[in-house]
Amino acid sequence: SLIQFETLIMKVAGQSGMFSYSA
């Protein structure tokens, strides 16, 4: 997967408090 996309998801998920994301 794309590093930039994963970083974006991680940032959004972290701010939303919904870190149900698999690399």
UniProtKB/Swiss-Prot annotation:
PTM (free text): Contains 7 disulfide bonds.
One Gene Ontology molecular-function label: toxin activity
Family of this protein: Belongs to the phospholipase A2 family. Group II subfamily.
EC number assigned by the record: 3.1.1.4
Domain of life: Eukaryota
Localization per Swiss-Prot or TrEMBL: Secreted
UniProt keyword Zinc-finger present: no
One Gene Ontology biological process: lipid catabolic process
Tissues in which the protein is found: Expressed by the venom gland.
CC per GO annotation: extracellular region
Main location as per UniProt: secreted
Class in the EC hierarchy, top level: hydrolase
Catalytic activity from the UniProt record: a 1,2-diacyl-sn-glycero-3-phosphocholine + H2O = a 1-acyl-sn-glycero-3-phosphocholine + a fatty acid + H(+)
Protein name stated in the entry: Acidic phospholipase A2 CTs-A1
Cofactor note: Binds 1 Ca(2+) ion.
